[in-house]
Structures are given as C-alpha cells and as structure tokens.
C-alpha cells in the first residue's frame, strides 16, 4: 500500500469545481497527487501554480506533472507569502486554491531530515533548509518551561511537563530515536500501551513550531480569500484540531456564520450580505473505503468556502 495516497482526492477535486480554462493554486504540492488531478482537468488556457517549501518535492513533482502537460509553474516558497509569490508571476486573481495540510512531502521519508520518529536521524525538522531554527536547537537550548509550552500548545500533549523535564535532564540529545526513548521514559505505561506512537505528539509539536505552521496557515488563508474570483473556491484538508480551529474561524468569520447563528434566535431579520459562503456546513470526512485503504486519512477533514 502506498502510504502517500492523496487524502480525500476525489472529494477535494470535485468541490474545487474546476473550470478547464481557470487559474488554480495548489499551496501544498508535496508529491503532486492533487496537482496531477487538477492539471488533468485544465485545457490549454488553464494554468496551475503549485507551491512547496522543499526543493526536493519540486524537482520530483516536475517530472510527474510534465507527463500530463506543461500548463503549470512550480514555486519554491512558504504559502504564508501566497499573494507575493503569485504577484511575482503577475497573478492577482484565481479560480480555486487547494491546501492539503497533511505531512506527505518527500523529505518525511528521508531519515537525515529528522521528521520521523521511526527512523534514526539528526534533530532537524526544517521543511525549508534555508531556514535556521532546528529541532536540535530547541531540544538542547530551550528552557524546560519553553519546551513544555511548545509540546502542550502545538502537540496537545497531556504529559508535556514530564517529557520536557526528562529532555532537559538528558541533554545533550542528538538524534531522533534518542529523543523517542527519552519521551517513552517520561510516559506512564497506560500511554505506552496505546496504539498511537508515544512520540507522535511531541514530534508534531516540534515540527509545527520550527516551521511556524499555524501562523503560516492563518496568514495564507486570509490572503487566499482576497485572491478569489467570483464563484471561486478554497478547499482545505486538515489533519488535527489546531488546523481545524484556524480554518473554521477564518471561514466562519468570512461568511457571517457566527452572526447568523446569533440572530437566528432573535425575532428580527437582518440583511447580512457576505462576500463568501460555506459550500458545506460541516466538513467532509473520508469514506469507509478510503479509511480502509489509506491510514493517513483517519483524521482528515475537507472544508470548502466560495466567493459569491
């Protein structure tokens, strides 16, 4: 089984509502699973811009996409700079934008990049190798309280205090598997017996912090809304509650959803004209078949907004 099957592929492409001559953006190129499907639906007038922080992902995706057609441009950069990355290419309005926030870029499988808690490698975790902050610096130089806060805030780790205490006691720590053993030693037996890997939350927290993922997502989504043509859509696939909260808040604030909920209980009619509408009231989850075939899809949710 390919563990990098694109999640919610059919649903996200369907809800993107692709026009053959439209301009589309894939903000998370990764292994080009979604980009490939978008490109297949475009004619010679249509065009795809795909963004990734990692040059390895871009180099590999280029070969794959060229087999479909050449109506695309791959951009190395952080999607938090979405407007600027497109403006450089004289693009100011688009017909659809896709985000797949799952970690599926090629670098995850390379032990030397330090993302995996299953393979030994240096404590790195940078998506963009041009950035400077690494997991090694955080683990070996941050205070116990700083590390605890990162694990709790970005990993929702209930045992953040005991893990951070063990980390500080065990310094210096140089490899991913060394860190995994330290995390395990800080956790009670009942947690170690659970199905989920005991280091998953800590590694998620470090990755999010080092790559500034949540702030990048918030900034990018706000820019994405401003880029939409009329009837254009944004589709976002989230994988954990921290991402969900950001998407939900931005989408609901943009559509007057909260105001409508408030006024629905009052005996007044208000004209709440909004520039955007939620295409689906509740996010779409994977089908039972997809859940069976692709373990990555278990926590995935698809959110869709449209400009009126």
Curated annotation (Swiss-Prot):
Function statement: Specifically methylates the N4 position of cytidine in position 1402 (C1402) of 16S rRNA.
From the UniProt record, list the reaction(s) this protein catalyses: cytidine(1402) in 16S rRNA + S-adenosyl-L-methionine = N(4)-methylcytidine(1402) in 16S rRNA + S-adenosyl-L-homocysteine + H(+)
Chain residues that bind S-adenosyl-L-methionine = 32-34, 52, 79, 100, 107
How is this protein named in the record? Answer: Ribosomal RNA small subunit methyltransferase H
**Stated family:** Belongs to the methyltransferase superfamily. RsmH family.
The record's section on InterPro entries has: RsmH, SAM-dep_MeTrfase_MraW_recog, SAM-dependent_MTases_sf
Enzyme class, top EC level, equals transferase
Chief localization: cytoplasm
- Provide the species name: Mycoplasma mycoides subsp. mycoides SC (strain CCUG 32753 / NCTC 10114 / PG1)
> Which keywords fit this entry according to its UniProt record?
Cytoplasm, Methyltransferase, rRNA processing, S-adenosyl-L-methionine, Transferase
* Segments traversing the membrane: none
**Gene name tied to this protein:** rsmH
One Pfam family hit: Methyltransf_5
Give EC number(s), comma-separated: 2.1.1.199
Q: Any idea where this protein resides?
A: Cytoplasm
Q: Which Gene3D superfamilies match?
A: Putative methyltransferase TM0872, insert domain, Vaccinia Virus protein VP39
Which cellular component terms (GO) are annotated to the entry? cytoplasm
Which cysteine pairs are joined by S-S bonds?
none
Q: Which GO terms describe its biological process?
A: rRNA base methylation
GO MF term set: rRNA (cytosine-N4-)-methyltransferase activity
């Amino acid at each position: 089984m390919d563990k990098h099957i694109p999640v919610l592929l059919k649903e996200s492409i369907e809800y993107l509502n692709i026009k053959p001559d439209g301009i589309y953006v894939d903000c998370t190129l990764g292994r080009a699973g979604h980009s490939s499907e978008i490109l297949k639906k475009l004619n010679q007038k249509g065009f795809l811009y795909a963004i990734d922080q990692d040059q390895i992902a871009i180099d590999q995706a280029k070969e794959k996409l060229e087999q479909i057609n050449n109506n695309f441009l791959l951009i190395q950069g952080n999607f938090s700079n979405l407007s600027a990355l497109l403006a450089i290419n004289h693009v100011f309005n688009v017909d659809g934008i896709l985000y797949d926030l799952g970690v599926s870029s090629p670098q995850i499988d390379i032990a030397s990049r330090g993302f995996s808690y299953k393979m030994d490698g240096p404590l790195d975790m940078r998506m963009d190798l041009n950035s400077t902050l690494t997991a090694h610096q955080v683990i070996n130089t941050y205070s116990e309280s700083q590390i605890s806060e990162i694990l709790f805030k970005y990993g929702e780790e209930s045992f953040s205090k005991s893990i951070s205490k063990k980390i500080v006691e065990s310094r210096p720590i140089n490899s991913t598997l060394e860190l995994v053993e330290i995390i395990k030693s800080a956790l009670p037996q009942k947690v170690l017996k659970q199905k989920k890997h005991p280091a998953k939350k800590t590694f998620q927290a470090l990755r999010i912090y080092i790559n500034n993922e949540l702030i990048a997502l918030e900034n990018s989504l706000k820019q994405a809304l401003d880029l939409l043509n009329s009837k254009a859509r944004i589709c976002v696939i989230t994988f954990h509650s921290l991402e969900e909260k950001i998407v939900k808040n931005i989408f609901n604030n943009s559509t007057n959803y909260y105001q409508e909920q408030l006024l629905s209980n009052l005996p007044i009619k208000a004209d709440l004209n909004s520039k955007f509408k939620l295409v689906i009231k509740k996010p779409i989850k994977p089908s039972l078949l997809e859940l069976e075939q692709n373990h990555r899809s278990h926590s995935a949710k698809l959110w869709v907004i449209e400009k009126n």
